[in-house]
Every structure is written in C-alpha cells, then in structure tokens.
Amino acid sequence: MKRKWEATLKQIEERASHYERKPLSSVYRPRLSKPEEPPSIWKLFHRQTQAFNFVKSCKQEVHVFALECKVGDGQRIYLVTTYTQLWFYYKSRRNLLHCYEVIPENAVCKLYFDLEFNKLANPGADGKKMVALLIEHVCKALQEFYTVNCSAEDVLNLDSSTEEKFSRHLIFQLHDVAFKDNIHVGNFVRKILQPAFHLIASEDEDMTPETTGHEFTHFSETPSEQGTCFSKMSTDIDVGESQTSNSEKLGRLGSAQQSSPDLSFLIVKNDMGEKRLFVDLGVYTRNRNFRLYKSSKIGKYVALEVAEDNKFFPIQSKNISKENQYFLSSLVSNVRFSDALRILTCDVPQSKQRVQCFSRTGTSVEAIEGFQCSPYPEIDQFVLSLVNKNGIKGGIRRWNYFFPEELLVYDICKYRWCENIGRAHRSNNIMILVDLKNEVWYQKCHDPVCKAENFKSDCFPLPAEVCLLSLLKEGEEFTTDTTADTETKSPHGPSSSVLSKGAFSDADWDNGIDDTYILEATEDAELAEAAENSLLAYNRMDEIPDELLIEVLQE
C-alpha cells in the first residue's frame, strides 16, 4: 500500500513539475484596466472568401490568417481574429505555430522579400553577405526612385535556415512610407532586379528569363520596352504635373540602367543545377499567404526567428513585450493611415490605361488618369458624386485601401473645396476618406495649414446602398445566381466529395479556386465547424477542458 502511495505521489510531483515548465494557457479575456485590448473574436472558416466577408462585416479591427491543417495536402483553414488575441494564444499553443498572414488584395503594405537557396547546390554562397548586399541595393533603389532614405537598421531580418537550405524573410520598416499593395511591391522588385535577369539570359542564350518565383521561364520584354514607371505619391500637384514627374523618373531609370549594378551575387543554382534568383518572386500575388514570425511549415521544425545579423530593433514600449513588437513589425499588411504617410506605386502599362468604371457619362475621365476601380466601385461612384457639383467636374486621381481600418482614401483632383476654410484651395487638393466599418465619410486635405491643424471635417453617413453590409448582401445574391446558372449549364461538375479532399497545392490556394465550384464544398466544412465549436466552448469555460488536459499529458 505504501509503495503504491509513493508511486502515486511521485507521479503527481512529476505532473506538477511538467505544468510548471509548460503551464496551461489561460483564456483570453480583455480587461478594463487595459483599454487597448480588443474584444474577443476568434472565428474559423473553410474558405478564404468567407473569412474576408466576415472581416468586412465586423466592426472591430480583425485580420485573416491561414492555418495549415495536414502535412502534404496543402489544405488550410482561415482564422479571423485581432493581432492582440492571436498573440495571446500564439505564445503558448503549438497548434498555432504553422500560421500565415494573408496579405489582403489591394491593401497598402510594407516592402518584403522571401529569400532562399539550396546550400548543397551552392557550396560557395555566403548567405549573410548576399542578404547584406541585397539590402544595400534595395536601399539605393528606394533613394533613387522615391527619395526614401533607409538602411539595414530599417529591415527586420528573419531566419528559418536549415543545414540544407538558406532561408530568410526581409520586411522593410520604412518611416511613414508604404506601397499601394503587394502587386506594386512585386513590380518594384522585378524592376530593380532587371540586371540579374539580363545576366542569366546572357549566360544562357537558350533560356529566356522570367521571374515567376522559384524558376526562370519567361521574361519577354526589356526594361525600356516594358515601360514600368516609378512614381512617389504626389499629393499637392495635379495630373499633368504628375505625368511630368513620372517621365522624369523614367529618365532616371534609363540612365541608371546604362550603368547597371553588379547583381551576380543574386544568381544561385537549384538542386537540378539550373540558375535562378536568390529572391523568390512568387510571393507578390493577391491574398498571398506569408509565414508568420515564429511559425514553421507543417511537418518542419525550423521556425522564423530573428536572424543573428538582424539590425532592426523595435522601439521599446512598456505595454508591449519585445517579442510582441517583433511580431507586429513582421506583419506585412500592418500599416495604418496617417497624414504623413507616403504611398509608393510602381505600375505596368496595363494598369495605366483609362478605366471606364470611373466615368459617370460612359466616356473616359481625364482626371482619373488611368487608376483602376477600388475594391468597391459603388463607393467610387458615390465619391465622384460628391466632387461633381456646382458646375465643377472633379475626379478621383487615385485611391489607397488600408485593410486594418477598412479605410478607403481617395485623392481628389479638379475639386478643391475645403470645409475648414469654407472655400476652395487655390493650389492644394483634398482627400475624401471613407470609413467602411463606421459607415461614414469625411474630408481632409493636403494644404500645409490644414495639415498643421490636423483638420478633419465632420463625419457624414454613407448612403445605405453603399454600406458594406448592403454590398456584401448583393455580392452573395450575385454568387448564388451565378452558381445556379453554372449548375444548370454544367450538371456534371466536380462532386463535393472530390472537392472536400483538400488536396490542393499552395499555388491553388494562393491564386484562388473558382467560387462556383467551391460552394459545393461548404457542405463538407465539418473540420472548420468542429474546430470553431471547440474553441468557442473553450473560451466560455472557466475550468480547463478535458481535451486540453489529455493533449498536454500526451506531449
């Protein structure tokens, strides 16, 4: 009896020691003593589009993250939560450590890079030196094309290298500067790496280089023929002057190409011995999944950590830990609007064509000068109605979308009436800001005096027909109608059993699969629903769930 008791006591002591080393995670509950903590929102979705629709209907600032489910099948479920709540659980729950930020389509974002090469295929490559040279080259390009000053101290350098592969993520922390979206980031990166493309082409005449990510396959146009233009955000000149500015940038680009920098250090070999770039150019696609700080790929054991040669150190805050600050800095789409923020663009010719959707008369509008519709064309039309009155025909020069705040910022041209001074500015343009979460719009302007006063007009309600819930409802009705039509025309489409297997590649998930087919798979969302229900139940309980106890005991 005594031996049995001693064995039981020893087992209890071992468990107590285990829990001291690995304590059970508590439940996230915002506290009144910390008003900065957002309410609890933790919702899982089987489809990415459902997750984004929920974000748009949510009044809180929430974000979409992708969680890998199983090794090898490429399937992911999508989590919607706040940065604060994700970090609360992320610190202690292993099942969250295969997590990706979903960089929203059209959203303002940071400049970022994904770097990798096979060490065995490149025995002489010095990864750290290559990273330093790349950062130096990018900083020079930012200064030359956008007059943006930065250095290695403004670059968060994350490492997930193994004995076989060198792997880094670079996220630039530019001061009051961001890119219009990650497509513009990709255009900029491809442009500044042109000398490396040409070098590969000259070394192998049988290969036409292209920058599709992991391999070189096709790059049909020279830099001058491609006509990509660089322009910084001009907020106090009208369209004609903006065109001149762009021409000057192109001239500088041409002169820079005549004395191309040596980018031979960027050329590496894959495991087949084929030449490719050190920079992965496949990470600049819409709704891109980009691995989070401290996450590893599922089935792998090396997470993204701060690199030994990292020179970026976040500003210390008494309310936020250093690790949390690194986490927030690593988020590519974590950019907030401010009057001082400059938005950088890098367009290709296709996006410089005049776009009919902005025209209220059915003809192209010169004032728009080719900027495409925002994600909400109905709101574009509403904004145009605000600046087309009293005989003045204003236009939208450009728009920028801030995903965290669901804020659309429209730069207006040919309409300068300012509520602050009660008349039109003589030379400075205005902005119309549409707050989609709060369903209001207001005016700010680029005039230095108004900026110094931090002027913001009164808020005015959006018409009901352009509010997000109304637009989402219309979108759902359209999708339903389209699905019904597709089912009529294609009765032999793929079955839900086939679609529910989840054997999709990363590329499939990144590029998106036709919603009309995936709608059938919603019946097979038990995985997401079960996970969601368990998490919701977990958040409601004060006691520790049995499932969590079992999981901890088995580790």
From Swiss-Prot:
Mn(2+) binds at residues 114, 116. Residues 1-22 form a coiled coil. Its main location: nucleus. It catalyses: ssDNA + n NTP = ssDNA/pppN(pN)n-1 hybrid + (n-1) diphosphate; DNA(n) + a 2'-deoxyribonucleoside 5'-triphosphate = DNA(n+1) + diphosphate. Residues 480-555 are annotated as: Interaction with RPA1. Transmembrane segments: none annotated. Can act both with Mn(2+) and Mg(2+) as cofactor in vitro, but Mn(2+) is the preferred cofactor in vivo. The polymerase activity incorporates correct dNTPs with much higher efficiency with Mn(2+) than with Mg(2+). The fidelity is slightly more accurate when Mg(2+) is the cofactor compared to Mn(2+). In the presence of Mn(2+), a conformational transition step from non-productive to productive PRIMPOL:DNA complexes limits the enzymatic turnover, whereas in the presence of Mg(2+), the chemical step becomes rate limiting. Belongs to the eukaryotic-type primase small subunit family. DNA primase and DNA polymerase required to tolerate replication-stalling lesions by bypassing them. Required to facilitate mitochondrial and nuclear replication fork progression by initiating de novo DNA synthesis using dNTPs and acting as an error-prone DNA polymerase able to bypass certain DNA lesions. Shows a high capacity to tolerate DNA damage lesions such as 8oxoG and abasic sites in DNA. The zinc knuckle motif binds zinc and is required for the DNA primase activity. It facilitates the binding and selection of the 5'-nucleotide of the newly synthesized primer and the recognition of preferred initiation sites. The RPA1-binding motifs (RBM) mediate interaction with RPA1 and are essential for recruitment to chromatin. The interaction is primarily mediated by RPA1-binding motif 1, which binds to the basic cleft of RPA1, with motif 2 plays a supporting role in RPA1-binding. This is DNA-directed primase/polymerase protein. It comes from Bos taurus (Bovine).
